[in-house]
């Protein structure tokens, strides 16, 4: 039966080879069987520019390109860790880049996709930071810096982010229900899929279904499957 996959929040890095191994297995064995593959952000733990080269980056690019060349339509939506992924990455892999909110039609069903961080409006400090780093002039300036400098800046930002999380409640870092409902109504859908919060779940809410993609861990890959009959669910071992 025809089907598509949705993944997010893999946070791939050279310090966690077990996550890369899970991704390799998925891309070599499951992904080629799908019609479409949607990656909803934070594929990488951080991204400092399309010009960065590493063994991991090349491996991931090659895997996505291979799946794309096998006829799978691949899509990428930026996360809060890899929002600097650009057109060069898209060209190298064959993915189509999505904006922050993307409306798709899959098997006659309208679905709203987003990474999920834009729904967490109660985290005021993060939203202020997000607005700053998404300014195009600042991004252009950052990308003009030497790679080593960019890497140091990214490491400092990541460390501060991890520190700040310790002082925030789970409620603040979760989506705002009222705002999320407004977004769903704005786009006129009854199915929303997002990641970011790392809380894999399928929520039946008033008037719509909200599917939250989980983060990938040492022994678990969070993979959502939707087939042409309209059935959906997370793949379990």
UniProtKB/Swiss-Prot annotation:
Gene3D superfamilies assigned: 3.60.21.10
Localization of this protein: Cell inner membrane
Cellular-component GO terms for this entry: cytoplasm; extrinsic component of plasma membrane
SUPFAM superfamilies: Metallo-dependent phosphatases
Membrane topology: Peripheral membrane protein
Domain of life: Bacteria
GO MF, one example: UDP-2,3-diacylglucosamine hydrolase activity
Keyword Hydrolase included in the entry's annotation: yes
UniProt catalytic activity: UDP-2-N,3-O-bis[(3R)-3-hydroxytetradecanoyl]-alpha-D-glucosamine + H2O = 2-N,3-O-bis[(3R)-3-hydroxytetradecanoyl]-alpha-D-glucosaminyl 1-phosphate + UMP + 2 H(+)
Cofactor note: Binds 2 Mn(2+) ions per subunit in a binuclear metal center.
Pfam families: Metallophos
Keywords: Cell inner membrane, Cell membrane, Hydrolase, Lipid A biosynthesis, Lipid biosynthesis, Lipid metabolism, Manganese, Membrane, Metal-binding
Binding residues annotated for Mn(2+) 1, in chain numbering: 9, 11, 42, 198
Cofactor(s) listed: Mn(2+)
Pathway this chain belongs to: Glycolipid biosynthesis; lipid IV(A) biosynthesis; lipid IV(A) from (3R)-3-hydroxytetradecanoyl-[acyl-carrier-protein] and UDP-N-acetyl-alpha-D-glucosamine: step 4/6
EC code(s) of this entry: 3.6.1.54
Residues holding substrate: 80-81, 123, 161, 165, 168, 196
Binding site for Mn(2+) 2: 42, 80, 115, 196
CDD domains, per the entry: MPP_YbbF-LpxH (cd07398)
Gene Ontology terms describing biological process: lipid A biosynthetic process
PANTHER family: UDP-2,3-DIACYLGLUCOSAMINE HYDROLASE, UDP-2,3-DIACYLGLUCOSAMINE HYDROLASE-RELATED
Protein family: Belongs to the LpxH family.
Function: Hydrolyzes the pyrophosphate bond of UDP-2,3-diacylglucosamine to yield 2,3-diacylglucosamine 1-phosphate (lipid X) and UMP by catalyzing the attack of water at the alpha-P atom. Involved in the biosynthesis of lipid A, a phosphorylated glycolipid that anchors the lipopolysaccharide to the outer membrane of the cell.
Stated name of the protein: UDP-2,3-diacylglucosamine hydrolase
Taxonomic source organism: Haemophilus influenzae (strain PittEE)
């Amino acid at each position: 039966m025809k089907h598509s996959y949705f993944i997010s929040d893999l946070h791939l890095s050279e310090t966690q080879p077990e996550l890369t191994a899970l991704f390799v297995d998925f891309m070599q064995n499951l992904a080629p069987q799908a019609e479409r593959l949607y990656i909803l952000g934070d594929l990488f733990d951080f991204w400092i520019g399309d010009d960065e080269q590493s063994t991991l980056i090349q491996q991931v690019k090659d895997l996505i390109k291979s799946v794309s060349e096998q006829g799978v339509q691949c899509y990428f939506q930026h996360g809060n860790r890899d929002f600097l992924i650009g057109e060069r990455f898209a060209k190298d892999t064959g993915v189509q880049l999505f904006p922050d909110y993307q409306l798709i039609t899959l098997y006659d069903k309208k679905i709203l996709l987003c990474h999920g961080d834009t729904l967490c409006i109660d985290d005021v400090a993060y939203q202020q930071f997000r607005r700053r780093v998404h300014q195009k002039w600042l991004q252009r300036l950052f990308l003009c810096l030497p790679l080593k400098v960019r890497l140091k800046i990214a490491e400092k930002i990541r460390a501060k982010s991890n520190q700040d999380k310790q002082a925030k409640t789970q409620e603040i870092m979760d989506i705002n229900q009222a705002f999320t409902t407004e977004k769903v109504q704005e786009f006129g859908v009854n199915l929303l899929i997002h990641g970011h919060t790392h809380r894999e779940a399928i929520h039946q809410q008033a008037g719509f279904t909200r599917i939250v993609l989980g983060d990938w861990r040492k022994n678990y890959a969070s993979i959502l499957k939707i087939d042409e009959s309209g059935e959906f669910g997370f793949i379990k071992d």
